[in-house]
Amino acid sequence: MQGNLPPEAQEKLEELQDLQQTAQQVAAQKQQAETELQESQTALDELDDIDEDSTMYREVGELLVKTEFDEAQDDLEEKVNSLEVRVETLEKQEERVQEQFEELQSELQQMLGGAGGAGPAGGPGAGGA
């Protein structure tokens, strides 16, 4: 299929494929950040049920290190805030990639005289909401 395309169209198709790969990477990063965010929020919520005088430990690599309640809570709050920003940034990046994909797909279809089967259908495959 690609061998029959004009060089400009072949270049656009390669750009589409690159964007599709980028979209998949961004979606995977976003999913990982959302999972981490959910876990951190759950841990922060669990701190509400713990006595502030309880002995607490945090994981540092493969070790458990004793820590203070306030320090653990502050660290988790900071992590949650950071992850919320990360997820928001990835959502915006996902939107930009989707827009670029649709624009490029439209250009390719126009270049090929409106042939519907020119590029990958259904967007970059980022999935998710």
Swiss-Prot record:
Molecular function terms, GO-annotated: protein folding chaperone; unfolded protein binding
Pfam families, sorted: Prefoldin_2 (PF01920)
Highest taxon of the lineage: Archaea
Annotated segments matching region Disordered: 19-52
Listed GO CC annotations: cytoplasm; prefoldin complex
Biased composition (Low complexity): 19-35
InterPro entries: PFD_beta-like, PfdB, Prefoldin
Keyword vocabulary terms for this entry: Chaperone, Cytoplasm
Compartment(s): Cytoplasm
Subunit structure of this chain's protein: Heterohexamer of two alpha and four beta subunits.
Similarity annotation: Belongs to the prefoldin subunit beta family.
Function: Molecular chaperone capable of stabilizing a range of proteins. Seems to fulfill an ATP-independent, HSP70-like function in archaeal de novo protein folding.
NCBIfam families hit by this protein: gimC_beta
Name of this protein: Prefoldin subunit beta
Lineage: Archaea, Methanobacteriati, Methanobacteriota, Stenosarchaea group, Halobacteria
